[in-house]
Amino acid sequence: MSAILSADDLNDFISPGVACIKPVETLPQKESQSENPYEVTKEDKIQPENLPPAQISLTDCLACSGCVTSAEAVLISLQSHAEVLNTLDAYPEFRLSNESGQDDIKTTETADSESRVFVASVSPQVRASLATTYGISEREAQCMIDQFLSGSQGLRAGGKFHNGFAWVVDTNTMREAVLALTADEVANSLTSIDPLNTLPKRPILSSACPGWICYAEKTHPFILPHLSRLKSPQALTGTLLKSVLSKALGISPTRIWHLAIMPCFDKKLEASREELTDSAWGPTPSEPHTPVRDVDCVITSRELLTLAASRGISLPRLPLKPLPRSYYSPFPDRSLDSFLFSKRSSGQTAASGTSGGYLHHVLTTFQAKNPGSQIVTQRGRNADVVEYVLMSPGGEPLLKAARYYGFRNIQNLVRKLKPARASRLPGARQSATSAGGSRRQLASRNAASAGSGTDYAYVEVMACPGGCTNGGGQVRIEDAREAASNMSVESQTEPPEAALKPTPHEQRAWLARVDEAYYSADSDSEVPATSEPASVISRDAEIHGVLQHWSEYMNIPLSKLAYTSYREVESDVGKTQTGPNDTARVVELASKIGGGW
């Protein structure tokens, strides 16, 4: 298991109060034979029991409610900074030549070569975490990551082959594609008749959070028809990179190794899903083959620091400036190159939130289609529950949506959406009058209990309280203090005094600083803002054009490239295993690259 994942991390930064929804089970103590059962003991003589320490494993707590089986925990442990180093030292880098232009990248590699194309994708929440840790801007954090992954002073400075990453992609780019498709999905669900159930049921629930998906698949299968069918930005980025590069370079997807740097550990689970492999979008193979993951490895913000320390690289000492364009070969398609690496606004604002802005984009898209309409916001029982209503100029509600962050709030949402279950004893009879009255009462109760949930058109659901900037893999305030201490030692200055465990107030203040860094991405950019920013409608139209070009380039329908599926899974947590043991199941899962979901 990744050494950075410890019991202290499993609260997923739910502070100041940590409430585990999985009870800790203890066995009754064996009674001492030396005690007299008839002896009366006074209270002041009762000695406190020395209970064994509670053992909370990844099986218990990652994604909560026993969503992760012990076999899947092993699959997660395979994705760590050690795997990154081992892979970089196991294969030479695929050599690319950009002498002939963007659409015709030449290479001297042979088809049977063992070389690999190393590509990486980085989420904006990771950049915000590093920016806060080292006291730099979000843009400088991106330069730091680029220098580390691809520069001569980073990973290329060491290792067996001096390998680095050929391309480093911002997941914000594919997030914009997911946003445009999400708005289409919601609009179609409101206006289209869907007898074949190709569209999710209303309310549509966002599906970008793997912890939430894991929870729904294993505990509430009745939720699955409501889940958005779209891939997450991480998954969609992996599909694009593997599909385009394998075709353009004439190599198998197995020779393209994709590293994703994400804010939470649950993204490792997402990368292990068998639905997110080349078997979902690639041509039907003539011979049986092992599916290839779209994302080979996921590490978190903290694991990125561990990766640098393992190579003896000081991240803050790297140049905080962009790498020259000569370090990167142009992406092997001109349209996709300009789309993936263009300099434009990220749209990371306080209004859109810290988790990608899915709900905000849906609201602004419908608002743009209804001139004069206004978005009315109403806070729920806490800051992580917010309801939104798009009101027409005449005061009529056009669209209702909501945001639910954190598992406690998610459970409340699930209860609202749970279908009613008639309670009737077998063989019992009711008169027509009483039966009709009971039905009316049941219908009224159902309407009262479910009305606040089922009338939503869209709900943005995230497992972490506060959103993705508060992911379990983000750099903690303790880690930042340790990094500052190490920098003081390197610069031979007096290190800061050792601090006690941060208080809840300090943790909230730290998260607020990370949020501020996340929202300041556009202000940190050196690209001058246009005087007339593109409208939501025109920007979505541009993205649809790029997605259509990708589909035509690959000759694969967009429905296979951008969409995925879910299925009910029975959890084995807390159950007596009568079948194969965990070791056998791990071998089976690993051979299927992410089965077991």
Swiss-Prot record:
* 4Fe-4S in keyword set: yes
A single MF term (Gene Ontology): metal ion binding
User: Which terms are listed as keywords in the entry?
Assistant: 4Fe-4S, Iron, Iron-sulfur, Metal-binding
Which residues take part in binding [4Fe-4S] cluster 2?
Answer: 209, 264, 464, 468
Bias (Polar residues) occurs at 430-447, 485-494
**Pfam families from the xrefs?**
Fe_hyd_lg_C (PF02906)
Positions bound to [4Fe-4S] cluster 1: 20, 61, 64, 67
Signal peptide limits: none
Q: Would you kindly state one Gene Ontology biological process term found in this protein's UniProt entry?
A: iron-sulfur cluster assembly
According to the record, the residues making up region (Disordered) are 419-447, 482-504
Main function: Component of the cytosolic Fe/S protein assembly machinery. Required for maturation of extramitochondrial Fe/S proteins. May play a role in the transfer of pre-assembled Fe/S clusters to target apoproteins.
- Family, as annotated: Belongs to the NARF family.
Recorded protein name is Cytosolic Fe-S cluster assembly factor nar1
Q: What is the lineage of its organism?
A: Eukaryota, Fungi, Dikarya, Ascomycota, Pezizomycotina
Gene transcribed to yield this protein: nar1
